[in-house]
Regions:
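Short glycine/serine/threonine-rich phosphate/pyrophosphate-binding segments
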Residues: 14-16, 117-119, 142-144
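Short hydrophobic alpha-helix segments
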Residues: 30-32, 87, 157
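Short, flexible active-site-adjacent loop segments at beta-strand->alpha-helix junctions, enriched
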Residues: 75, 89, 115, 173, ...
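Active-site nucleophile and cofactor-binding loops and adjacent substrate-binding regions
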Residues: 87-91, 110-116, 136-139, 298-306
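Glycine-rich phosphate-binding loop of actin/hexokinase-like ATP-binding domains
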Residues: 129-188, 324
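Short beta-strand segments
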Residues: 9, 70-74, 112, 136-142, ...
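Conserved PLP phosphate-binding loop immediately N-terminal to the Schiff-base lysine helix
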Residues: 112-126
Length: 333
């Protein structure tokens, strides 16, 4: 029988989970659609998630004992165990996730922002090993971020520090999932780049297969594939996205002075040519000169190993008092 932590990453599109032992060995992982159950029915979702977790557990030859649970979720509050007003989830308002999920697993349980969980995973198991100051940016349905300063994850006074996706890009701009106007994630995310494409289709006359696709049919992956093939609309969309991301990262560098910035998520898979190099170029262009050529922009070293699941499980092991990799972190209230 093997003791494991259950690591869960709740995203706007998919929820990933896996079993991780105290040494960071990932026994098994899978993903399920976050939108499988009726919108705004958190009880139905958690029951569905529990059933899927138990199915995966039964597929493993070795008998596993879940001794702790770590969860990463948009707007997950480490101090309160609640998801609060997450723009890209159908669960609205304040959701007492830890309290509700303990009905299924009555073990030590901790919740944090999904990007914070990814940052912890990168710091312990990935490319940020040995780094004391770095930023993790997750580019999925929305834009998440986790900030590590002086070797510690920054939670802030109330647990919501590091919401880079909701800093203003344009005060009168696009509406985000929370109804705010001009948030960065409404431009720089899988959803944001789709909106950019449809704006460009109206402004440009270039022929493109994108004109034959409806908004609901279009996926960021298709935009990426067309951009690699030289499609002018898709390439312009990536350039615009990279410019906005580079601008805001230059601001973050001026505040935090990180050693590196890691990009993770579906949009980050666009690679060097479409995203990393142009983002770095724009960041340097807008950078306060004392920081120029000092900050690396890197892909997550855990892209294929699920940084958020590993990070969430690491937090669970920390709650159990056996994770020696993490420095002391504040105790949830």
């Amino acid at each position: 029988m093997k003791d494991v932590a259950l690591g869960i990453d709740i995203g706007g599109t998919n929820t990933k989970f896996g079993f991780v032992d105290r040494d960071g060995h990932l026994y098994a992982e899978t993903s399920v659609p976050t939108t499988k159950t009726p919108p705004d029915d958190i009880d139905a979702f958690l029951k569905y998630l529990y059933d899927e977790i138990e199915l995966l557990k039964k597929e493993i030859a070795e008998e596993l004992t879940i001794v702790g649970v770590g969860i990463g979720a948009p707007n997950g509050n480490y101090f309160t165990g609640t998801i609060e007003y997450a723009p890209n989830l159908s669960f609205r308002g304040v959701v007492p996730l830890v309290e509700l999920f303990k009905k299924y697993y009555n073990v030590p349980m901790v919740l944090t922002n999904d990007a914070n969980a990814a940052a912890i995973g990168e710091m312990i198991y990935g490319g940020a090993k040995g780094m004391r100051d770095f930023i993790m940016v997750t580019l999925g349905t929305g834009l998440g971020s986790g900030f590590v300063a002086n070797g510690e994850l920054v939670y802030g006074h109330d647990g919501f520090a590091g919401e880079m996706g909701h800093i203003l890009q344009k005060p009168t701009g696009r509406t985000c999932g929370l109804g705010r106007r001009g948030c960065l994630e409404s431009y720089v995310s899988a959803t944001g780049i789709k909106r950019t494409v449809f704006k460009l289709l109206a402004d440009m006359n270039d022929p493109t297969p994108l004109r034959d696709v409806t908004y609901n049919q279009l996926a960021a992956k298709q935009i990426t594939e067309l951009a690699h093939q030289g499609d002018p609309i898709a390439r312009e969309a990536f350039d615009y996205t990279s410019r906005l991301l580079g601008q805001k990262l230059s601001d973050m560098v001026a505040i935090f002075s990180p050693e590196a910035i890691f990009l993770l998520g579906g949009l980050a898979k666009a690679g060097d040519e479409l995203l990393f190099k142009p983002t770095k170029r724009y960041m340097e262009e807008y950078m306060f000169q004392v920081f120029r050529d000092k900050v690396k922009i890197l892909p997550s070293a855990l892209e294929d190993k699920n940084a958020a699941v590993l990070g969430a499980s690491a937090l669970a092991w920390k709650e159990l008092g056996v994770n020696k990799h993490l420095r002391e972190m504040p105790t949830p209230k």
